[in-house]
From Swiss-Prot:
Origin species: Neisseria gonorrhoeae (strain NCCP11945)
Subunit and interaction comment: F-type ATPases have 2 components, CF(1) - the catalytic core - and CF(0) - the membrane proton channel. CF(1) has five subunits: alpha(3), beta(3), gamma(1), delta(1), epsilon(1). CF(0) has three main subunits: a, b and c.
GO MF entries: ATP binding; proton-transporting ATP synthase activity, rotational mechanism
NCBIfam families assigned to the protein according to its UniProt record, in alphabetical order: ATPsyn_F1gamma, PRK05621.1-1
Protein name: ATP synthase gamma chain
């Protein structure tokens, strides 16, 4: 019954793995609910900042703020690449990286260079492994990242845009659609689109003018930064919700696969045990007949 003992050892090993994946599935389910709530709570702030900024930009067209410049010749682009810090979340990071690398290659074919800010260790490791130009990064952000952890890398990129060292900035992340579906997204963060500050932007539900201190332009310049930061944080929240959803689904699949493997191993064990018993009975019968 040496074979039977080996099968039992495999069954116990798979059962232990199944317990781990089941626990990870439950943890991911809990974390996903929390990240979804954080994502929902961040939206009203971002929307209010966008609305006030849009109103100010439309009433102060000669603002001269570099972050609001809309037409530039593209010579160098920046990317804010958001991925997870941990794995075991299916093809989430692979799909985002595939979309990101395709865009990088497209720019390189046009002779346009890139500068990358990585938020999340998986994206950072991928970029470093293929020799991309990473200018700043933030990793080990945890389950509840603080905006202060992102300010350094983001400020670096925004300042380079203000100095005309970068002409366009893309935001790349995994967007949360629902529990079963997450999609890689790439958005133009800078220059800010017409749908945010142009004539096509939603109009505020009022017609009166505020008095701004110290000046409307100073407030506008401040709000532009806050708006950009809120968009990035919203994308990070989306990515974290996507990560937990993808990990929950992946761990459920792993748990189910472990259950199927255990059933198959038990079937093999029972068959081998049945064969061994049949052999022993045959030997006993043969021995009795010989006597």
């Amino acid at each position: 019954m040496a074979v039977g003992k080996e099968i039992l050892t495999k069954i116990r090993s798979v059962q232990n793995t199944q317990k781990i994946t089941k626990a990870m599935q439950m943890v991911s389910t809990s974390k996903m609910r929390k990240t979804q709530e954080r994502m929902r709570l961040a939206r009203p702030y971002a929307e209010k900042v966008r609305m006030v900024m849009s109103h100010l930009a439309q009433t102060n067209t000669d603002h001269g703020i570099p972050l609001l410049e809309s037409h530039r010749e593209i010579r160098r682009v920046g990317f804010i690449l958001i991925t997870s810090d941990k794995g075991l979340c299916g093809g989430l990071n692979a799909n985002v990286l595939k979309k990101f690398l395709a865009q990088v290659q497209e720019y390189r074919n046009q002779g346009i260079e890139e500068e990358i800010v990585c938020l999340g260790s998986k994206g950072l490791m991928a970029c470093q492994s293929i020799g991309l130009n990473v200018v700043a990064s933030a990793v080990n952000l945890g389950d509840t990242p603080k905006m202060e952890m992102l300010l350094g890398p983001l400020t670096e990129l925004f300042q380079r845009y203000e100095k005309h060292e970068i002409d366009k900035i893309h935001l790349v992340y995994s967007g949360f659609v629902n529990t079963m579906r997450q999609e890689p997204r790439m958005e133009v963060l800078l220059p800010i689109g017409e749908n945010v500050i142009g004539d096509s932007a939603p109009k505020p539900p009022f017609s009166w003018e505020y008095r701004y201190e110290p000046t409307a332009l100073a407030v506008l310049e401040y709000l532009v930064r806050r708006y950009l930061e809120s968009v990035v944080y919203q994308a990070l929240s989306d990515n974290m919700a996507s990560e937990q959803a993808a990990r929950m689904v992946a761990m459920k699949a792993a748990t189910d696969n472990a259950g199927n493997a255990i059933k198959e191993l038990r079937l093999v064990y029972n068959k081998s045990r049945q064969a061994a018993i049949t052999t022993e009975l045959s030997e006993i019968v043969a021995g009795a007949a010989a006597v």
